[in-house]
Amino acid sequence: MASLALLRRTTLSHSHVRARAFSEGKSSNRHRIEKILVANRGEIACRITRTARRLGIQTVAVYSDADRDSLHVATADEAIRIGPPPARLSYLNGASIVDAAIRSGAQAIHPGYGFLSESADFAKLCEESGLTFIGPPASAIRDMGDKSASKRIMGAAGVPLVPGYHGYDQDIEKMKLEADRIGYPVLIKPTHGGGGKGMRIVHTPDEFVESFLAAQREAAASFGVNTILLEKYITRPRHIEVQIFGDKHGNVLHLYERDCSVQRRHQKIIEEAPAPNISADFRAQLGVAAVSAAKAVNYYNAGTVEFIVDTVSDEFYFMEMNTRLQVEHPVTEMIVGQDLVEWQILVANGEALPLSQSQVPLSGHAFEARIYAENVQKGFLPATGVLHHYHVPVSSAVRVETGVKEGDKVSMHYDPMIAKLVVWGENRAAALVKLKDSLSKFQVAGLPTNVNFLQKLANHRAFAIGNVETHFIDNYKEDLFVDANNSVSVKEAYEAARLNASLVAACLIEKEHFILARNPPGGSSLLPIWYSSPPFRIHHQAKRRMELEWDNEYGSGSSKIMKLTITYQPDGRYLIETEQNGSPVLEVKSTYVKDNYFRVEAAGVINDVNVAVYSKDQIRHIHIWQGSCHHYFREKLGLELSEDEESQHKPKVETSANPQGTVVAPMAGLVVKVLVENKTRVEEGQPVLVLEAMKMEHVVKAPSSGYVHGLQLMVGEQVSDGSVLFSVKDQ
């Protein structure tokens, strides 16, 4: 049974049940979709293209100038430019996208998720232009996409709602009064869109105005609509959503629920299906409520009804309905063995749903972990950079949805998600084992990611037993985040880094030896002395020094220099010493296998090691993956010396520090607001600038009271990560 279920999952796209238990009506083959334009980018565009190709349907990609060489462009049958990088001029330009579809001869447009996927105006424009919109009717998008309107509809239908304000009057004084009526803390949320963009938790009236205005700006930038709703903030909630599907013959069913409680910045980072620790009766209630919600607006195609579950009272409340395919839809596909994109196309073609409710299977358990380019230590701020090394694990029960390849750049213009790692197991425990193993094998070098943090989440004892809620990260922050004041943790971190630094040294030198042994350099004096007569000098214990700079997350983002002395032994082993009192000499045997792979023996343990290296700005950047550990080191180029070589320069990696009061950009981004003028007096914590990157705003505040100096930025300027923005001085 399990093997059959696994076969169904791994061939989602090859074999599907076709039991027509629902009313079907008449459908004509004369208008079947043969060519689809995918109005999106990244992993979801690649995902849609993959299913379309299997069905024999041609695909058209659209791209901005920033995405000309992207994977979603390369995988489509053809691609059409729609504008410059800013989303409002390209992926949010509905007229340009419809024009591209007509020019390409496509009969249908698939919006993916985000961008125009929940725009009723865009769905209507498609239909008016003679194009099939692969999604719900514009009326349902309008009713349910507007979170205030959807709550009014659900309230009228008797669905429980969280206390809040969902009215049309957006006057800020009115909103302040409503917030007072609801009672703090309140949740500020845009009425359109999703993904946590624009959401703010406000704890006191003093914070309200600034948070409200920032939420409006983010909503306008992300969704083109800046209206806001208010809700009472439930202190211990779970986020559980139900996947629903309808067809144009009046049939609606659900495909069970997903738990999306583990979030940061109000964005999901680990999702799972089915939800853990709920009863069959509770599951049934959720399903019935979700189907009723969909039927209330004559819904068809894919949708998700989101509920907030109060873990104190065990009551659930309607939160919102997403009228599109969700980012996390793969976990549902894994437990029901169906391709939801194929279902979307079937429904768009006028066909009935391929299964009835009683035929929908529920097999095993699935997790999805979202891999983001972000700085966890900086509060999960988005990061940019080049994927110099990118290796993902894939197997019969492990699936990776991605829109990038090695060498691609993650830019500031779009969402920083690199990939979705999806795993399946026969039960939750088995799936969790695969999730932890796959995360340990997920390799990215070139920019910071949240992979290490996801590993901490997956390995946490509370997560293992399914004790999840939306405050999971805050509740267990002492376990999940580093504490520079914890001497035990600091020592453990240093010892792990020291071990991996030693393995790095042995692996890099062994690879050089391997290459030079097969390509003798002819005694070049430019090479280290122990390679002047390959393989090595007989009876000469050549030594080599290396200095590696380790990014020490246990030291508040500071780095630590590790000075290594490597001695080659006649038996092919390396003795590696670290210049620190009490550090033992480590004996390492390294065997180069191929590419980035090594087989290493150290401290009585033999295991596989992966080392990725790239050079930039006269620095060699080195990443090592060993077991569940990943470490990142930097080395100045040209600093490797043999003991026999004379050098006037002692190896040294410089680190720069800015003067006290200097404020640097926490991320690469766009200046969207300058709140004070240069040489103005500010108070500690006063907002000075607002930066935007990947549709998220970040307020830059004064670090102390004083006068602003060096503030020369203007709205519309781009700043790089770490660049100096201004300083605050006493005078």
Curated annotation (Swiss-Prot):
ATP binds at K147, E231, H266. Mn(2+) 2 binds at E320, N322. Residues 653-729 form the Biotinyl-binding domain. Residues 32-478 form the Biotin carboxylation domain. It holds the Pfam family CPSase_L_D2. The active site is at R324. One of its GO terms (biological process) is L-leucine catabolic process. Keywords: ATP-binding, Biotin, Ligase, Manganese, Metal-binding, Mitochondrion, Nucleotide-binding, Transit peptide. InterPro entries: ATP-grasp, BC-like_N, Biotin_BS, Biotin_carboxylase_complex, Biotin_carboxylation_dom, Biotin_COase_C, Biotin_lipoyl, CbamoylP_synth_lsu-like_ATP-bd. This is Methylcrotonoyl-CoA carboxylase subunit alpha, mitochondrial. The lineage of its organism: Eukaryota, Viridiplantae, Streptophyta, Embryophyta, Tracheophyta.
